[in-house]
């Protein structure tokens, strides 16, 4: 049977995302997909999904949902919490990093994504028809329905019902988190368009994120990076990828993100490594950051290390019985008899 969730308030920039449209960049369609794939996978893991199910990507404040057909199991991942307004009149706080089963009529009021990005996963995933191999929203391409725009009030999100008789939910012993420190980059592919001083400035100063950011990219504020000459500020358009750091004629970098275009005519001074790309999703306006140059071999090791850390985090999940439920299986399996007494005189 199918579940159904109604969008009462979409919040700012709430979209549906999965792993994205891989293999379509040659026809000019961006990959899109999760800004922080590790965090989205964590949300999916808490409801028992495989890592590829579509989730709600939460970038702002004010999203409110109601279960129209259920029950529905959900989980939040990220620096976020929600008010759970149950149909029976009880009001609860639903923290992140654990699953919960919502009944028909229950509402969920989501707080702010304090670190700039959080995810809500639904057991069984969202049952929206994929377009070009993905359920990821990308409004610039004019995809139909909710995949071609951000969510709106009244949108209906078909999903799976959760009908397990087992009352246990899942939680993690600790949140999944990414390391701090400089954002690691590989220089190039057009670092020769910049002076040695520009490379030193890129790696040697603090940069500040600006309000000019969305799923396509973010502009940084700092000392301008000098091209070797005026002509070096433009190139014949070539391929770009999420993580590429473009530098237009004004010398201020633009870091491309998941919805980035597929080609561009600004030279690219460096590219953020795959292991650090998810961290960019959490850099709200005014955040300060630094870049560190590494080699390709070190970048591969960083990604392998991240996947090992992920597997260790996955092993910390544990089942628990929410307050108000009785775990009959555990009760029947317990030895509640501590001894026997003869009642005869």
Describe the residue ranges of each PLM region.
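Conserved "landmark" site that anchors the functional core of diverse proteins
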Residues: 1-345
């Amino acid at each position: 049977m199918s579940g159904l969730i109604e969008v009462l308030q979409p919040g700012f920039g709430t979209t549906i995302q999965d792993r994205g449209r891989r293999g379509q960049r040659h026809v000019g369609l961006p990959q899109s997909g999760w800004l922080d794939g590790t965090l989205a996978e964590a949300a999916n893991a808490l409801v028992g999904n495989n890592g590829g199910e579509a989730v709600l990507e939460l970038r702002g404040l004010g999203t409110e949902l109601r279960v129209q057909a259920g029950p529905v199991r959900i989980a939040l991942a990220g620096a976020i919490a929600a008010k759970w307004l149950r149909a029976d009149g009880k009001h609860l706080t639903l923290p992140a990093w654990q699953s919960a089963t919502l009944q028909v009529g229950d509402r969920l009021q989501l707080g702010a994504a304090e670190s700039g990005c959080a995810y809500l996963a639904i057991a069984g995933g969202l049952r929206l028809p994929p377009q070009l191999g993905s359920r990821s929203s990308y409004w610039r391409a004019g995809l139909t329905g909710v995949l071609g725009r951000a969510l709106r009030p009244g949108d209906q999100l078909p999903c799976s019902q959760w009908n397990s008789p087992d009352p246990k939910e899942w939680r993690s012993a600790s949140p999944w988190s990414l390391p701090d420190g400089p954002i690691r980059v590989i220089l190039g592919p057009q670092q020769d368009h910049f002076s040695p001083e520009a490379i030193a400035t890129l790696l040697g100063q603090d940069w500040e994120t600006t309000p000019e950011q969305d799923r396509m990219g973010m502009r940084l504020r700092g000392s301008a990076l000098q091209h070797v000459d005026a002509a070096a500020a433009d190139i014949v358009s070539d391929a770009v990828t999420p993580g590429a750091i473009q530098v237009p004629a004004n010398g201020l970098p633009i870091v491309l993100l998941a919805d980035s275009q597929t080609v561009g005519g600004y030279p690219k001074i460096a590219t953020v490594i795959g292991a650090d790309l998810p961290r960019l999703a959490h850099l709200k306006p005014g955040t300060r950051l630094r870049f560190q140059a590494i080699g390709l071999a070190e970048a591969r090791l960083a990604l392998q290390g991240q996947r090992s850390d992920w597997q260790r985090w996955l092993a910390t999940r544990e089942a628990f019985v929410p307050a108000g439920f009785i775990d009959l299986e555990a009760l029947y399996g317990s030895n509640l008899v501590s001894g026997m007494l003869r009642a005869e005189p």
